[in-house]
């Protein structure tokens, strides 16, 4: 899965703490100020369960998040789904019907999980709007890879397999912030 995640990185936008930009990190750091650890003049850390949030102005969005729970980072999974979808659109290709069915089911489950676990909680409609914007933002960047579409179909084969299903089910089994790191 790690090799396939690296393939996805070729298509995906840089991962921050929250690829759909829905988590209010400032509010979390303010609300849990007593739990914030200042580790340097520019960096502070907040641990919420198995999620470690890092605030650092040198980061692309000022924050990043690391899911240390072992189930997999939901933000990464949402980014991979968006990568597959944007590549299929960019290359005017289609996945096999059974994979499309699985993809749509995962998309609905993942976006529901995302909205329920972001802070503040977000409606499915807002999460879907942000997801669609992420997909659209990746289409142009995916076009040069159309000659190597097998990279994406291999990723889809892996993600939408029975083995992948067990990983995805485990990933969605524990409510937590949908951060993007580590990426599978």
Protein language model features and the residues they cover:
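Compact alpha-helical subdomains of small soluble proteins
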Residues: 20-59, 99-184
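Helix-boundary capping/turn motifs
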Residues: 52, 74-81
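Short, hydrophobic/amphipathic alpha-helical patches that form generic packing surfaces
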Residues: 78-90
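Eukaryote-specific, low-hydrophobicity, charge-rich regions
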Residues: 53, 60-69
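N-terminal signal peptide c-region/cleavage motif recognized by signal peptidases
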Residues: 12-14
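Sec-dependent signal peptide recognition
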Residues: 1-7
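Second-shell loop/turn segments in exported
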Residues: 65-74, 88-99
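Basic, ligand-binding patches in group-transfer machinery
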Residues: 17
């Amino acid at each position: 899965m790690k090799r396939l995640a690296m393939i996805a990185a070729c298509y995906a936008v840089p991962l921050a703490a929250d690829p759909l930009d829905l988590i209010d990190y400032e509010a979390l750091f303010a609300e849990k100020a007593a739990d914030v650890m200042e580790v340097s003049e520019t960096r502070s850390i907040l641990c919420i369960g198995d999620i470690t949030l890092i605030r650092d102005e040198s980061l692309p969005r000022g924050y990043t998040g690391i899911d240390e729970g072992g189930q997999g980072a939901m933000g990464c999974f949402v980014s991979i789904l968006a990568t597959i979808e944007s590549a299929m659109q960019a290359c005017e290709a289609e996945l096999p019907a059974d994979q499309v069915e699985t993809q749509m089911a995962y998309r609905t489950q993942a976006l529901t999980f995302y909205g329920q676990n972001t802070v503040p909680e977000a409606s499915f409609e807002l999460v879907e709007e942000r997801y669609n914007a992420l997909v659209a933002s990746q289409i142009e960047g995916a076009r040069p890879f159309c000659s190597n579409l097998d990279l994406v179909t291999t990723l889809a084969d892996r993600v939408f397999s029975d083995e992948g299903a067990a990983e995805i089910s485990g990933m969605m089994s524990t409510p937590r912030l949908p951060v993007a790191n580590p990426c599978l």
